[in-house]
Amino acid sequence: MGTPAGAGTRPTGAGTVEGVGIPPGLQTDYETLLSRFQEMDSVRFEDFTELWRSMKFATIFCGKMRNLKKNMFTKEALALAWRYFLPPHTFQIRVGALYLLYGLYNTQLCQPKQKIRVALKDWDEVIRFQQDLMNAQHFDAAFVFRKLRLDRAFHFTAMPKLLSCRMKKKVQQTEVTQKFKDPNDRVMKLITSDVLEEMLNVHDHYQNMKHAISADKSMPDRALSLVKEDFFENIKNIVLEHQEWHKERKNPSLKPKLKDGEENGEGSSEEPERCERAVSLAKIKAKAFSAVVPVSKSRRHRQSKLDSSDSDSGSGQVQGRAAKRKRTREPAGPAGRKRSSRSKGNAPNERKEEKSLHLSMPIITEEEEEDMGGVRKAEFTAPKRKRKC
């Protein structure tokens, strides 16, 4: 249905939804409700409820719909109302949006209820707005906000919208209605060209009256000089400076260039913003690498010495085992056997064999094992006890 023309018209509701997305007339209905609330020049909850009933906003969720479309419509309705609750809208529009969120949340037909999606980056602004309500003693609006928090109506998320793979790279920015927008330059709104012209006329008339009243027409009496003569010029200069500052703030590219000396002096101290991140990362990396403790040379030598000692101990164990086996072999042969001349001539060969035993594992044949076994049995056989008759 179209935009409500009168107070008794029914707003565009769930019956017009054909797919996912904002219904075509829902935003128009919201702006109509908020504009009428703005015209009342009030922030009272009772005034908003009167408009809510007259526009029949309670029937916004009525209509035959399946549960899936009902949930999607409720999410979109709450998300659209949430936009008017954030800056740069005026204080009165934000209060009206708070009442609108309260009405939509409590009249929805979803079970369980759909929550209001709130990005974490916006929550600080919301808390600041709640503090402003308390300071201004708008307790009805503060009570509505507290009731929503107690009902756990807010769903805190990282992003304002649910991200997916099909999201566009460039997110479309919503346009703010000019009549709902909070003026960012209140000075220029207060002091216009007409106001300056009127102030100039009053100041000239004041100076003329001082000359007319004083005895000396050329020099007015000092007792009559209650306002400085350059009062208007000072105000005019301040307004012009504010205009230039506001333009530079909006468009930094319009900022006048400095002189060569100043530019060179400040250019070395100020780095471009795009390089700040790279510089900070480089500092972090340098600090991380400098924290690594290098291994001292003494440890390396100590470690190599330990390795060499291990190898020496290993070779010493091999030598000890070979010596033990050599001792066990000596009694294996007959005690009265004499060495032949051939064995005497082969003495250097035996020494070489002993050296090779120190370096490699000894090889024991089966005959030697039998001989060693017999020797061990002979050594460790216990003497038999004689039986007593």
Swiss-Prot record:
Q: Which UniProt keywords apply?
A: DNA-binding, Nucleus, Phosphoprotein, Transcription, Transcription regulation
- The record's region (SNAPC3-binding) falls at 20-187
In this chain, the stretch annotated as SNAPC4-binding covers 183-287
Locations of Basic and acidic residues compositional bias? Answer: 245-262
- For bias kind Low complexity, which ranges apply? 1-15
Q: Which InterPro entries match?
A: SNAPC1
The terms describing its cellular component in GO are: nucleolus; nucleoplasm
Modified positions (Phosphoserine) in chain numbering:
S308, S309
| Gene Ontology MF annotations | DNA binding
Q: Does the keyword Secreted apply?
A: no
Question: In terms of domain of life, where is this protein from?
Answer: Eukaryota
Region feature Disordered, mapped onto this chain: 1-22, 245-276, 290-389
- Cell compartment(s), UniProt: Nucleus
Primary role: Part of the SNAPc complex required for the transcription of both RNA polymerase II and III small-nuclear RNA genes. Binds to the proximal sequence element (PSE), a non-TATA-box basal promoter element common to these 2 types of genes. Recruits TBP and BRF2 to the U6 snRNA TATA box.
Subunit record text:
Part of the SNAPc complex composed of 5 subunits: SNAPC1, SNAPC2, SNAPC3, SNAPC4 and SNAPC5. SNAPC1 interacts with SNAPC3, SNAPC4 and TBP.
Report the protein name in the record: snRNA-activating protein complex subunit 1
Q: Which organism is it from?
A: Mus musculus (Mouse)
The encoding gene: Snapc1
